[in-house]
């Protein structure tokens, strides 16, 4: 039997060991939380085949109901890893996102987006596709496929498990069967929706001061298209005659509409769109570097007048309602028609108004 003093020493030693272990675990846990959440977190997906793929959970997500899920779980039936190269502007990347989601589901593959696409879309929408870590992207043995802008039969049976898509797909033929899912992916964050609705609530009809019954979003694409369309594609952008005819189409069918005009050429719009009836509001800010305010306004309208471009397409697609678009905006021999099929670009129920091609007649082949 040990003397009492020895027993006390042993008990004290054991107590110190236990307290030290507890202190270590507490500090380790706190340090993990502090540093782990302050940096990007890698969430390994152990179900993937070699090479291992990780979901890249960006800092601060999810922090509120408005943010995207950081590590969503793919159904167990899906395999492989597909992504798409983010290219172009806001509307282009929306088309790439929707097409990736649809084709991956069709082929039973898991879809991931790259950080640049997340940076472009996540501040605006509640997107849910996980983000691929750059180091995993660089190690993956990708097969590459450049898509054309309409659904083809071969896209329904793509066998590559590691596929990186590219191109500028924005055709409803890829994803319209998933329309509600696509609309859900492109749900605006609350603050953007509320700000847009606040702008619309303040609008009044000029002559009577009454509240509008119907909001028609108008997107007028100008900017670089002023040179690109005639010089490269033998095409035109919308003129004032088209916009007048499109507005008259809605005036004939809807009571007391108001036209909410957005554009990357607002000065031209103010000078060329007839606002004398008191039902035209120049609401857009025209900021191409931060287009989401204009986009949010358009999607909260009941109907849409679009000209050309993917920005207008997505505004119309998400708003629903009636859509009027600029039709036949290139000469018949335009190279543009080799990469663009109107029947795959515009929904069948949308209403087309032919463009005025007279400025292009000097370019027409005899």
Swiss-Prot record:
| EC number(s) recorded for this UniProt protein | 2.4.1.69, 2.4.1.344
Q: Which residues are glycosylated?
A: 66, 302, 328
User: Its gene?
Assistant: FUT1
Q: What class of enzyme is it?
A: transferase
Give me the segments passing through the membrane.
9-25
InterPro entries cross-referenced by the UniProt entry: Glyco_trans_11
The protein in question is named Galactoside alpha-(1,2)-fucosyltransferase 1
Where does the protein principally reside?
Answer: Golgi
Please state which protein family the record places this protein in.
Answer: Belongs to the glycosyltransferase 11 family.
From the UniProt record, list the reaction(s) this protein catalyses.
a beta-D-galactosyl-(1->4)-N-acetyl-beta-D-glucosaminyl derivative + GDP-beta-L-fucose = an alpha-L-Fuc-(1->2)-beta-D-Gal-(1->4)-beta-D-GlcNAc derivative + GDP + H(+); a ganglioside GA1 + GDP-beta-L-fucose = a ganglioside Fuc-GA1 + GDP + H(+); a beta-D-Gal-(1->3)-beta-D-GlcNAc-(1->3)-beta-D-Gal-(1->4)-beta-D-Glc-(1<->1')-Cer(d18:1(4E)) + GDP-beta-L-fucose = alpha-L-fucosyl-(1->2)- beta-D-galactosyl-(1->3)-N-acetyl-beta-D-glucosaminyl-(1->3)-beta-D-galactosyl-(1->4)-beta-D-glucosyl-(1<->1')-N-acylsphing-4-enine + GDP + H(+); a neolactoside nLc4Cer(d18:1(4E)) + GDP-beta-L-fucose = a neolactoside IV(2)-alpha-Fuc-nLc4Cer(d18:1(4E)) + GDP + H(+)
Q: Which Pfam families match?
A: Glyco_transf_11
One GO BP on record is: olfactory bulb development
Q: Which residues lie on this side of the membrane: Cytoplasmic?
A: 1-8
Q: Name one GO molecular function term.
A: alpha-(1,2)-fucosyltransferase activity
Lumenal side, ranges: 26-366
Q: Does the keyword Glycoprotein apply?
A: yes
């Amino acid at each position: 039997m040990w003397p009492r003093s020895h027993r006390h020493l042993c008990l004290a030693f054991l107590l110190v060991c236990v307290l030290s272990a507890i202190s270590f675990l507490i500090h380790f846990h706190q340090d993990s939380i502090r540093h782990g959440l302050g940096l990007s977190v890698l969430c390994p997906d152990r179900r993937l085949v070699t090479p291992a793929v990780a979901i890249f959970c960006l800092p601060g997500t999810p922090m509120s109901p408005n943010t995207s899920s950081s590590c969503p779980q793919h159904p167990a039936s899906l395999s492989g890893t597909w992504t798409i190269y983010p290219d172009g502007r806001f509307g282009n990347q929306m088309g790439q996102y929707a097409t990736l989601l649809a084709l991956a589901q069709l082929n039973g593959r898991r879809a991931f987006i790259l950080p640049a696409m997340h940076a472009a879309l996540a501040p605006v929408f509640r997107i849910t596709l996980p983000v691929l870590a750059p180091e995993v992207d660089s190690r993956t043995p990708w097969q590459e496929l450049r898509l054309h802008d309409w659904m083809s039969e071969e896209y329904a049976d793509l066998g590559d498990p590691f596929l990186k898509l590219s191109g500028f797909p924005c055709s409803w033929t890829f994803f319209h069967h998933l329309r509600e899912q696509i609309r859900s992916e492109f749900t605006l964050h609350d603050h953007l929706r509320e700000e847009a609705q606040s702008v619309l609530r303040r609008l009044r009809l000029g002559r009577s001061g009454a509240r509008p019954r119907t909001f028609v979003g108008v997107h007028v694409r100008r900017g670089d298209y002023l040179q690109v369309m005639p010089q490269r594609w033998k095409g035109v952008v919308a003129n004032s005659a088209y916009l007048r005819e499109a507005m008259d189409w809605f005036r004939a069918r809807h009571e007391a509409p108001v036209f909410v005009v957005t554009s990357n050429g607002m000065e031209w719009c103010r000078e060329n769109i007839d606002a004398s009836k008191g039902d035209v509001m120049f609401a857009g800010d025209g900021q191409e570097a931060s287009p989401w305010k204009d986009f949010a306004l358009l999607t909260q309208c009941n109907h849409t007048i679009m000209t050309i471009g993917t920005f207008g397409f997505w505004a119309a697609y998400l708003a629903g309602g009636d859509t009027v678009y600029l039709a036949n905006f290139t000469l018949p021999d335009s190279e543009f028609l080799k990469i663009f099929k109107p029947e795959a670009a515009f929904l069948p129920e949308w209403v087309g108004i032919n463009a005025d091609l007279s400025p292009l007649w000097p370019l027409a082949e005899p």
